[in-house]
């Protein structure tokens, strides 16, 4: 709870962490936190008041029992400045007035501080939470200048603390645990016995928020129309100031765990079905005991307000005006051109083109040259100075095509190449190891035997070939068993058909004689 505390024309904010603080806890926080900051010792004796006159007693009493809520102003009066005769009588009368009232009065705002109360002491106790001076006939209050200074001080502290205890006015403004005052009054007056009754009360309030007026009854704003439910079926009739000559009827039928809401209009003696929506009462209404507050019964009011109005209320109003041959009064189409262009500027080009296909009015607005100039400068950052006769839409189209083409070419350029087929006859990549010797390929002992180059690079066989500086592998290097270009094994260039003396395949001698190792006689 956040409070404002004033002592000798100085106001300071004070935060009480307890959920339901008592007067004694407030006094302890004042002694520990506030008095040292104002230059007083912790032994300073003071009285807690709401009007600088009547002291509050009873440390066990909660602040709520005195009608103190978050944001109120608490006035501290030092003991030597407190008039003694006022303490017992005012305290007793204050307790009696609080006990006689069923509900504690709410805190008055700072704008009510200057309003004099001339109805006697009984009425003044009903406004016990008001701060600043009291103009009583039997007691002299502070001067007007002191009142003005105190009001300005309180307003400045309230603005500095950033605390504004405001209740929601519409269902779309609510949070969990909050309901508008109008919904609270409707719920209490309707006497709901089921969750379906509570949901229909909420639907009726949403129709009232949209400008519909109950028809055929003299229902007040804080009560439901007459005969709104009969034999388990709910029926609500409305008129709208923008649809003179037509009326809307909502027929709500419970179907198990759902409620079907059918909207029809009556125009020129005929009835036309417009829209229907299904709602689940359990999603927005809690089961509660009779007499519970509406804040404990309803939930997700913001979601239901958006869903119900977008799917039923606004289409119903637009269709009714269309049947009555009346022009549109709301929506994007009826906005001035300036507002349309400001909205279109926030969209991308695809959304603008989609809106241009809706109707003729939006087509004209979407072809505005100023709009396309803004879109062009936003999307392309072109600093070229162009003449007033520039077709910005056509320029945007050409620039957009160029950008798409450049993106496509960039995508093709950076595409990874396909892995080459193993042993491809035409290598895709250049060979990493080119022979440095001048000998033709295939010579035994050349670089070809040291690092045989296969037709393709990157095939699975090449990865098994050890390179210079690499550790030996368990796979032997792939190399030819004989020279494919040179003579065949066992051949002799001097004596064809005879093996050379140091050949790996010596000539096999005939049976019964040794080999003839003599050189031939030339």
From Swiss-Prot:
Cited SUPFAM superfamilies: F-box domain
Bias kind Polar residues: ranges: 87-114
Domain of life from the UniProt record: Eukaryota
GO CC, one annotated term: nucleus
Spans annotated as Important for interaction with CDK6: 129-169, 381-522
Extent of motif RFDP motif: 481-484
InterPro entries named among the record's database cross-references: F-box-like_dom_sf, F-box_dom, Fbxo7, PI31_Prot_N
Subcellular location: Cytoplasm; Nucleus; Mitochondrion; Cytoplasm, Cytosol
Region (Important for interaction with PINK1): 92-129
Region (Important for dimerization and interaction with PSMF1): 180-324
Region (Ubiquitin-like): 1-88
GO biological process: autophagy of mitochondrion; lymphocyte differentiation; negative regulation of G1/S transition of mitotic cell cycle; negative regulation of lymphocyte differentiation; negative regulation of neuron apoptotic process; negative regulation of oxidative stress-induced neuron intrinsic apoptotic signaling pathway; positive regulation of autophagy of mitochondrion; positive regulation of mitophagy
Residues found modified as Omega-N-methylarginine: 431, 451
Residues carrying Asymmetric dimethylarginine: 518
Recorded GO MF terms: protein heterodimerization activity; protein kinase binding; ubiquitin binding; ubiquitin protein ligase binding; ubiquitin-like ligase-substrate adaptor activity
Region Disordered, annotated ranges: 1-20, 85-128, 459-522
Pathway(s) annotated for this protein in UniProt: Protein modification; protein ubiquitination
First-listed, main subcellular location of the protein, grouped into a coarse class: cytoplasm
Domain F-box: residue ranges: 329-375
Pfam family, one: F-box-like
Note on domains (UniProt): The ubiquitin-like region mediates interaction with PRKN. The proline-rich region is important for protein-protein interactions.
Role according to the record: Substrate recognition component of a SCF (SKP1-CUL1-F-box protein) E3 ubiquitin-protein ligase complex which mediates the ubiquitination and subsequent proteasomal degradation of target proteins and plays a role in several biological processes such as cell cycle, cell proliferation, or maintenance of chromosome stability. Recognizes and ubiquitinates BIRC2 and the cell cycle regulator DLGAP5. Plays a role downstream of PINK1 in the clearance of damaged mitochondria via selective autophagy (mitophagy) by targeting PRKN to dysfunctional depolarized mitochondria. Promotes MFN1 ubiquitination.
Protein name: F-box only protein 7
Organism: Rattus norvegicus
Gene, per the UniProt record: Fbxo7
């Amino acid at each position: 709870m956040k409070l404002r505390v004033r002592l000798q024309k100085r106001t300071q904010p004070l935060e009480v962490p307890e959920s339901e603080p008592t007067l004694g806890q407030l006094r302890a926080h004042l002694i520990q936190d506030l008095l040292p900051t104002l230059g007083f010792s912790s032994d300073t004796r003071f009285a807690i008041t709401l009007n600088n006159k009547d002291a509050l007693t009873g440390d066990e009493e909660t602040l709520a029992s005195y009608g103190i809520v978050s944001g109120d102003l608490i006035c501290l009066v030092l003991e030597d400045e407190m008039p003694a005769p006022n303490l017992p009588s005012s305290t007793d009368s204050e307790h009696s007035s609080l006990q006689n009232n069923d509900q504690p009065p709410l805190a008055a705002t700072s704008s009510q501080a200057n309003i004099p109360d001339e109805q006697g002491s009984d009425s003044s106790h009903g406004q016990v939470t008001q701060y600043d001076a009291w103009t009583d006939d039997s007691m002299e209050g502070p001067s007007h200048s002191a009142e003005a200074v105190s009001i300005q001080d309180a307003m400045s502290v309230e603005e500095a603390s950033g605390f504004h205890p405001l209740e929601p006015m519409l269902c779309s403004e609510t949070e969990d645990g909050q309901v508008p005052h109008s919904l609270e009054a409707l719920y209490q007056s309707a006497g709901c016995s089921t969750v379906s009754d509570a949901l229909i009360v909420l639907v009726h309030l949403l129709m009232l928020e949209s400008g519909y007026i109950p028809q055929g009854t003299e229902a007040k704003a804080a009560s439901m129309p007459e005969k709104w439910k009969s034999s388990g079926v709910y029926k609500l009739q409305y008129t709208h100031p923008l649809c003179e000559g037509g009326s809307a009827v909502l027929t709500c039928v419970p179907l198990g765990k759902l409620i079907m809401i059918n909207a029809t209009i009556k125009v020129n003696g005929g009835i036309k079905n417009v829209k229907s929506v299904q709602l689940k009462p359990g999603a927005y209404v809690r089961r509660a005991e009779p007499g519970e507050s509406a804040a404990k019964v309803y939930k997700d009011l913001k979601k239901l307000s958006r869903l119900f109005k977008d799917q039923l209320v606004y289409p119903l109003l637009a269709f009714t005006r269309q049947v009555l041959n009346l022009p549109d009064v709301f929506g994007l189409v009826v906005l001035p051109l300036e507002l349309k262009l400001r909205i279109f500027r926030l969209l991308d080009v695809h959304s603008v083109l989609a809106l241009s296909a809706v109707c003729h009015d939006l087509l004209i607005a979407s072809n505005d040259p100023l709009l396309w100039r803004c879109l062009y400068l936003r999307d392309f950052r072109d600093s070229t100075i162009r003449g007033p006769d520039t077709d910005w839409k056509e320029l945007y189209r050409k620039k957009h095509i160029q950008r798409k083409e450049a993106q496509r070419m960039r995508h093709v350029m950076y595409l990874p190449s396909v892995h080459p087929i193993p042993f491809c006859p035409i290598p895709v990549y250049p060979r990493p190891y080119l022979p440095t010797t001048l000998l033709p390929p295939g010579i035994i002992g050349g670089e070809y035997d040291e690092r045989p180059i296969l037709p393709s690079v990157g095939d699975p066989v090449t990865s098994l070939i050890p390179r210079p500086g690499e550790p030996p592998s368990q796979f032997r290097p792939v190399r030819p068993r004989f020279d494919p270009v040179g003579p065949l094994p066992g051949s002799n260039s001097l004596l064809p058909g005879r093996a050379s003396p140091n050949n790996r395949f010596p000539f096999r001698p005939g049976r019964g004689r040794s080999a003839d190792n003599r050189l031939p006689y030339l």
